[in-house]
Design a protein with these regions (language model features):
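Active-site metal-coordination segments of metallo-dependent hydrolases
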Residues: 99, 103, 119-120
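Terminal, membrane-proximal amphipathic helices
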Residues: 1-81, 107-230
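Conserved phosphate/anionic-ligand binding catalytic regions in large, soluble enzymes, centered on
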Residues: 79-100, 197-203
Length: 230
């Protein structure tokens, strides 16, 4: 008989309260949506980033996407902004600050990309597609196990099926499980920041590389609204 421990991310997300890990996955997703997309304190919301960059790029969406990706890579290399968000708000996650920084930046970069391309990032299905983009190759497995087809991209798999709110919540939580599962490896890569000079450079390089990959994937997953679904 399979237990919750043996189940995959989607199956575990659909289970009732699973204890600490289940709660951690839920809290991580909530923070990514609430802070990464909607903003908090010094961390500007994705829609504001998109509007300002589009204005700076004089309406050129492609140039705006380049600026968004560049700016977030630079922030990823510097880090440190999480300390300004407030310990009480972030404490329940019990995650290393640099790991949370990375995921918040990746979430906002993806959401801003979607906004520039014409999507309503307040819609639940779009927000789920943003989270799925963070999961990378793992998202295909999540969608497959949910009975959705990702041939046209994660966005089309989620949007075209018009999933009800409970199903979207399960998908979001499954992404949370996958991201938490990566934290051990990601934290190891970033522990180099504790070592002066060389270690810090290695940690920054890892974040920049990963943000660059996610930025390219976001541009692919969120084509211009005028061409979406064709």
């Amino acid at each position: 008989m399979r237990t919750a421990k043996d189940a995959g991310a989607l199956e575990r997300a659909a289970l009732p309260a699973e204890g600490g890990l289940s709660g951690a996955a839920t809290r991580l997703v909530e923070r990514l949506l609430d802070v990464g997309i909607d903003g908090k304190g010094p961390f500007d919301p994705a829609h504001e980033i998109a509007a300002n960059v589009l204005k700076h790029a004089r309406g050129d969406a492609d140039e705006a996407l380049r600026i968004i990706a560049r700016d977030h890579r630079q922030l990823g290399a510097v880090g440190g902004f999480v300390t300004g968000l407030g310990g009480f708000f972030l404490m329940p996650l019990s995650l290393p600050a640099n790991v949370l920084e990375f995921y918040l930046l990746a979430t906002r970069m993806t959401a801003a990309t979607a906004k520039v391309r014409g999507y309503d990032i307040d819609q639940p299905e779009i927000r789920s597609a943003i989270l799925l983009t963070l999961a990378g190759a793992d998202s295909e497995d999540i969608l497959k196990k949910a009975g959705l087809h990702a041939a046209g991209g994660k966005l089309s798999a989620v949007a075209f099926d018009r999933l009800p709110a409970p199903a979207l919540m399960v998908l979001n939580k499954a992404v949370g499980f996958r991201l938490l599962g990566r934290i051990g490896q990601g934290t190891f890569a970033r522990l180099g920041r504790l070592v002066p000079f060389v270690g810090g450079l290695v940690g920054a390089a890892v974040d920049v590389y990963m943000l660059n990959r996610i930025g390219k994937q976001a541009a692919k997953e969120f084509p211009p609204v005028a061409t979406f679904g064709r």
